[in-house]
Amino acid sequence: MVGEGGTSAVYRADHPQHGVVALKVLREKLRQDRTAVARFTREAKFGTRVEHPNVVRTIETGESGPGGLHYLAIEWAAGEILERYAKRNAPLPREEVARIVIQIGDAVQAAHSAGIVHRDLKPDNVMYDPESHQVKLLDFGIAAATDTAPDERLTRAGFFVGTLMYVAPEALSGELVTPAADQYSLATIAYFLLTGSLPYLAKTPREMFTQLLSQPPIPLNRARPNLVFGPQVEAVIMRGLAKQPSDRYPDVISFANELRKALLATSVEDTGFLAKMKGLFGKK
């Protein structure tokens, strides 16, 4: 076993046609849970609809005999969960954040083009290989079609406890979640990668819930006292974190492109400044 969560365990396995795969198995205690099974099969359904180099490919799904275990075989992705990598290394270099965000944005845009909102974007649902700098988006288990009616959405008690810090405010107020919600989540991921902290610092889920609905996020330049970002970088991040979906960028790839441009422009400026300082002090 290479990983486990509340609903499933993940194993490294050999597939007869596809070689090494990640085999995700629904926990036995949940095989009679209709919501858990529906969510598990939904991951396979939506995963097969999004074909993109930055989305983990779904290879096979099924059940091991009548009444058996539900399983999902997906592409084996190199690297590690972005959450773990970022917790060890954040704040990450701006060029690295630009590479990560543009790949996630491109993958999510592909999902949106296929009529799917991911709804659970967070570093824990992203694989990242620091050697190749490749990103792979995971877990469409709570994704929804953009035309899904509110009474058809799958919910579960406690869902927001685990992912509340990355969820868009409109998702908390019962609105039908649109692609703009994924943009908000990606902006939160970018904020975390750049600073090592989050735009809201609540001590409890209840407090976080209240802050998300009623308070503005902490400005990027106030996240860490030793970090300073150019005004354009902060402006892009804060627009992505706007409370109202209509105040964000038109689509997620526009946000990702603007942030990449701002981060790389800042990096060039920083490099020039450092070069001048080294020359001033006679360093090579």
Where are these regions (language model features)?
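Activation segment signature within eukaryotic-like protein kinase domains
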Residues: I100-V101
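AlphaC helix of the eukaryotic protein kinase fold
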Residues: R27-R49
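Conserved short submotifs of the Hanks-type protein kinase catalytic core
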Residues: P66-I81
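C-terminal lobe helix-coil module of Hanks-type protein kinase domains
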Residues: M165-V268
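Protein kinase glycine-rich loop
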Residues: M1-G5, V10
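A short, aromatic-enriched beta-strand patch in the conserved N-lobe beta-sheet
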Residues: E60-G62
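Protein kinase catalytic-loop region centered on the HRD/HxD motif
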Residues: G105-I116
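Activation segment of protein kinases
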Residues: P130-P169, S173
